Amino acid sequence: MKEKILKNDYFLSLISKFFVMLFGFVSLIFLNRYLGTELKGEYSSILNYVTIVSAILQFGISMVYPRFKRRNIKNCYEIFISLSMIQVALYAVVAFVVAVIYDMNVNVALICVISIIAVFTTQLRYINMVEDMKRNAFIVFIMSLCNCVITVLAFLLLESNLAIALLIYVVKDLVIISLYLTKIDYPNLFKKRYVKYYFPILREGFLPMLSGLLIMLNYKIDIIMLNSYSVDFSAIGVYSLGLSISEYMWVVPDIFKDVVQKRTAKNNPIETVNFSLRCSSSFIIIAFIVLGLLNKQLFILLFGVEFAESFNITMILLVGAYSMIYYKIIGQLFISDGKSKQYFVILLVGVVANVVINCLSIPSWGIYGASVASVVSYNGIGIVFLWLYLRYYDVNVKEVLLVKKSDFVKIKKFVKSKEKKL
């Protein structure tokens, strides 16, 4: 029975995301209390740039892995890992040379170093997610636990320091990289015949890379624009907490997105997608109601009175979080199914709308204007993805909205299955 449960990819993704959410939330509490609003605003600003830079530097390699995996290419795993290693090594050399030649700003140097590490972490994580979900779930668990323990210790033992907080972020990524590297078959890693695949991978990854960049811009452009309008770091810190809490509502959609990514490496499991959308949408609705009932006092209790206003930001952003489940799950299907152009165009329009609305709303409404811009963008993107999915795959809208009675039977039975479709 235990072996059957551990072979079920829904269960593994569920357990992995549960611990990510649990340890991550504890880390978030202590990180915000450790830094306070001003340092947290500066910390979030730096990491937002890291996220965007790393999205560019990844070049979409891990995003096209399921597509190449479906082609039954011999040593596909080794080909992608070797390319990722070469890529990161080149970035490190270029960054070092530039740092030596030019008098690089400290923040710029930090962004470069952390971005290169983040690129390798992301490549390894998503490639291994397709290859071995069980091992990937274990590694994510270890990473989340280490990050949580180190953050709590920093809060208890150290004075507030931005450099320490950034170091914790780097250590988290280094832990996950070291765990992934233990699996690699090094003697079989670099072969001359792999080179012929590198250019096709980079070519096919270019559009997904642009799409990944648009994703990050859509998530992170608000904080960058708050910076550009000289909103003080304390307000940005308040906003960043509200954004982080709203992103926790995406944990359930991410569970199903991971499973969809794994299964679309073999086929297009429409019923799996429908089931995933129903469960995710129901969860978001319940979470919104529960959080609304708990009210602002919960934020004061957990994060301190200086972060009380983050509750308002969270509730606004949750309105957009519902529609983003359609992007997260359906978007993964589109990428794996070769619909990258449609995926890209939708995200591009969403990002442009986000930027325009931010320009109009931030000068008057500050962080509330940024949250409204995000909600409009999220809803627009999600609705278009849903409409195209219903059209392309001939799915009735009733099949994706809310859980059905039959879903509870499936949920009850899935722990008894190995890897059957739900």
Positions of PLM-derived features:
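Interhelical loop/hinge segments that connect adjacent transmembrane helices in multipass membrane
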Residues: 1-2, 6, 109, 134-139, ...
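Helix-loop junctions and terminal segments of transmembrane helices
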Residues: 24, 28-29, 57-73, 242-270, ...
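Membrane-interface junctions at transmembrane-helix termini in multi-pass inner-membrane proteins
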Residues: 7, 66-73, 118-142, 265-266, ...
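Transmembrane helix-bundle signature of multi-pass secondary active exporters and lipid flippases
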Residues: 47-55, 239-258, 287, 317-324
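Signature of the first transmembrane helix
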Residues: 4-59, 148, 203-228, 233, ...
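Membrane-water interface segments that mark the loop-to-transmembrane alpha-helix transition
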Residues: 9-20, 45-46, 50-106, 267-288
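Hydrophobic alpha-helical transmembrane segments
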Residues: 112-114, 139-186, 349-353, 367-391
